[in-house]
Amino acid sequence: MDKIALIGDVHANLTALEAVLEDIEKRNISKIYCLGDIVSKSVNPDIVIDIIKEKCDVILKGNCDEIFSSERALTRQFWTRMKIGEKRAKFLRELPIMHEFYLSGKLIRLFHASPYSLEHIYNPEYNNHDKRYNNKIIINPMELFKNTDFIGKSKNDKIPDVIGYAHLHMPIIFKVEDKIIFNTGSVGASYNKGEATYTIVEGELNSQKNMNMSISNVSVYYNLEKEIKYIEESDIPTKDDIIAYLKN
């Protein structure tokens, strides 16, 4: 059986990423897929990008990766944009949107947020009442399985059996009709203080034969004070906001 670790929303949190990678290594997992949002929030985006490039077999683009790598980055994004430099920014801009593969006969499709954009959001826990996303809220979970131009799919392409996404920062796994949806939670910006989450899928990789497979979410605690020290010692102008976010 093959094991794949799926991580997302690292958000430049080096301490959390190191803790997760250590946990993945202890579990003898050799394949790691990243579902985007490598940068933003914390203060080591350059180091985190380099580690992700080295360790991950698949890397997808998140909404923050797109925004913070832009040559038109706004003032609040400028610190990160300067920190990562043009070479890393170009790497982020050129990341793919979607990845899919067979595991034990199931077609698994991965993206950062949705088949519509890098910002649309589906949140089953809170009835999707989030004013930040305005008209980018997905109500019906089956919409996550749609084939769209945004992810390079046509109506004639096979509909996946499993959807894995990030963006939400909340680890979830549930069935809808005959399908499965899971969210990786967040490595670097979890809603639980000092906790990083990721997902493990296990089965026969690249096999279209129906066999046993499993999906599980994992929580790892990291040294929050160490990450806060990184932030305090930096010259990022939004350090107070970042520390408050990580602590609360």
Please report, for each region that a protein language model flagged, where it lies by residue.
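Acidic, His/Gly-rich catalytic cores of divalent-metal-dependent hydrolytic chemistry
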Residues: I173-N248
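Active-site environment of divalent metal-dependent phosphoester hydrolases
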Residues: H11-A16, S40-V43, C64-S70, Y116-S117, ...
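Hydrophobic, aromatic-enriched interface-forming segments
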Residues: I137-L144, F150-H169, I173-V176
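Short acidic-hydrophobic surface loop/beta-edge motif
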Residues: I97-G105, F174-V176
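Active-site-proximal beta-strand elements of phosphoester/diester hydrolases
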Residues: D2-H11, L107-S114, I181-G185
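Core catalytic region of metal-dependent phosphoesterases/phosphodiesterases
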Residues: D2-R93
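Active-site-proximal loop/helix segment associated with metal-binding centers of metalloenzymes
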Residues: A113-F150
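Glycine-rich phosphate-binding loop signature in dinucleotide/nucleotide-binding domains
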Residues: I24-I29, L103, K155-I159, I200
